[in-house]
Amino acid sequence: MNKRSLIAGVLSVCLMLAMLPAAFAVEQGEANITPQTTMKELRENPSIKGSGYYTYCREMLPIESLYWQNKTLAQYAKPELVEDCAQAMNLVVENYNNGVQVTWQIYTPEEIEANPSLGGAQLFYYPASTPGGKYALVVPGNGNGVTSEMEEGGSAAYQLHEMGYTVFVLRYRSFLAASDNAPLQDLGRAVQLITENADKFQV
C-alpha cells in the first residue's frame, strides 16, 4: 500500500467516525405546539413520540383516532384548558430534548409480565426549574372510561410547574382494568416510586 492510499484510508475512517454521532442521534421535535396544532401533528412530533407521553384522552377505541387525527388541539381539549395543555406538551418536548426521562413505569417488568394491565399505569414527569422543592401528584379525572393525562393532567401540571413545583401526572388503570380498587393501588405505587427515587427526581 502506498503512502497516498494509506492517507486516503485513514481519512475515510476519520470521516466515518465523525458521522457516527449524527447517525445515532435521537430525532427531536420542536416545542411549537399551539391550540391550532392537529392531533396528528402533535402525536407525530418526534419528542412527544419519543417521550412516551400518553395523549389519547378521548379515544376508547382505536378507530376513534381516525376521527380526531385532523382535529386541532382546540377542538380536542376543553376551551378553558387548551392553552395550558399546549404549553404542557411544549414542556414535554423541551424536557425530552434535554435528556429528561418523561415516562416512568410504576410497576416492575416482572409484575407487568404477570399482569399486563399494569403496563398502562405510568407517571409523566415534569421537573421543576429549581430542584429540591415540593412536588405535586396530579390524578386526572374521568376514570370510568378513559383518563385525561394530556388535557386535565397536562394543564394542571403546567400551572403547577409555573408555581415552582415538580409535577407528576398519573396514568392509572381505568374502565375494564379498574376493578378491585386498581386506581388506588396505582396511586399508592406511584407515591412509593417517587419516594424511593426522591434523589433522582430531585424532590
Task: Please report, for each region that a protein language model flagged, where it lies by residue.
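Hydrophobic core
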Residues: 11, 15-19
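N-terminal targeting or regulatory segments adjacent to alpha/beta-hydrolase or S9 domains
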Residues: 2-9, 21-117
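Alpha/beta-hydrolase active-site loop
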Residues: 178-200
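Short beta-to-alpha linker loops that shape the active-site pocket of alpha/beta-hydrolase fold enzymes
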Residues: 142, 171-175
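A short loop-to-beta-strand scaffold at the N-terminal edge of the catalytic core in hydrolase folds
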Residues: 115-127, 134-135
